[in-house]
């Protein structure tokens, strides 16, 4: 994806620091204080232009959401949604999510969303995929005991790789669809990419997974 440079983006982000948290590491262990309640916290890694996380926050006021996106020129579009209509249960982070433990403590997060992540198709780039084992370990470090990962993509190869990676890590699948839009799954909120790809006839794949809490018998 080629990103369009937006020279105003950084100034906009600095101006609205109540929405885009510039120092997330300082809130490590204290995100509930920042939100002002003890509601569950869900994060989206690679939030892009923010439609998904914004609509989720709007639909679920009793859940706090944090959208994490490293590209300034992209996250500013998510910020514009909050400027137009503020949601008290949504914050944004303009940082790389390579190590979430810098931002969150163990058990601070209830769910991780991964939507249409970069597939990094070349084998030598496998470690960059957000479902590679080091990332799975990273999510495990910040999730509650029964926390979940919800993963969605139109890329069959990435989906198959992710299922294998999660299984090898010892995760348990609680939901799996090989054609989400033609399933009986309810409550799906589409991302910008999802709408684009599905309109072209692409299948949408989805899996929900938990970390195994007991040893295999």
Curated annotation (Swiss-Prot):
Active site residues according to the UniProt entry: 118
UniProt xrefs under InterPro entries: SAM-dependent_MTases_sf (IPR029063), tRNA_(Gua-N-7)_MeTrfase_Trmb (IPR003358), tRNA_methyltr_TrmB_bact (IPR055361)
Record keyword tRNA processing present: yes
EC main group: transferase
EC number(s) on file: 2.1.1.33
Catalytic activity: guanosine(46) in tRNA + S-adenosyl-L-methionine = N(7)-methylguanosine(46) in tRNA + S-adenosyl-L-homocysteine
Keyword DNA-binding included in the entry's annotation: no
CC per GO annotation: tRNA methyltransferase complex
Keywords annotated in UniProt: Methyltransferase, S-adenosyl-L-methionine, Transferase, tRNA processing
Pathway(s) the chain acts in: tRNA modification; N(7)-methylguanine-tRNA biosynthesis
Binding locations of S-adenosyl-L-methionine: 44, 69, 96, 118
Binding site for substrate: 122, 154, 191-194
Cleaved signal peptide residues: none
GO molecular function: tRNA (guanine(46)-N7)-methyltransferase activity
Classification via NCBIfam families: PRK00121.2-2, tRNA (guanosine(46)-N7)-methyltransferase TrmB
Recorded family membership: Belongs to the class I-like SAM-binding methyltransferase superfamily. TrmB family.
Described function: Catalyzes the formation of N(7)-methylguanine at position 46 (m7G46) in tRNA.
Protein name in the entry: tRNA (guanine-N(7)-)-methyltransferase
Protein species of origin: Bacillus cytotoxicus (strain DSM 22905 / CIP 110041 / 391-98 / NVH 391-98)
Gene that encodes it: trmB
């Amino acid at each position: 994806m080629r990103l369009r440079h937006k020279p105003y983006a950084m100034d906009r982000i600095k101006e609205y620091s109540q929405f885009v948290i510039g120092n997330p590491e300082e809130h490590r262990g204290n995100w509930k204080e920042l939100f002002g309640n003890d509601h569950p916290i869900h994060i989206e890694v690679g939030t892009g232009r923010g439609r998904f996380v914004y609509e989720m926050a709007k639909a679920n006021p009793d859940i706090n959401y944090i959208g994490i996106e490293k590209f300034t020129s992209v996250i500013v579009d998510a910020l514009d949604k909050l400027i137009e209509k503020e949601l008290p249960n949504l914050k944004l982070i303009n940082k790389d999510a390579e190590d979430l433990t810098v931002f969150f403590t163990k058990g601070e997060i209830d769910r991780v969303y991964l939507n249409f992540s970069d597939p990094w198709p070349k084998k030598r780039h496998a470690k960059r995929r957000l479902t590679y084992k080091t990332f799975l370990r990273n999510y495990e470090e910040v999730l509650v005991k029964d926390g979940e990962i919800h993963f969605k993509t139109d890329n069959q190869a990435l989906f198959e790789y992710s299922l294998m990676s999660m299984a090898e890590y010892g995760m348990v699948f609680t939901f799996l669809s090989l054609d989400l839009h033609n399933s009986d799954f309810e409550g799906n909120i589409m991302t910008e990419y999802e709408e684009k790809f599905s309109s072209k006839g692409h299948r949408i794949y989805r899996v929900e997974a938990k970390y195994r809490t007991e040893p295999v018998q």
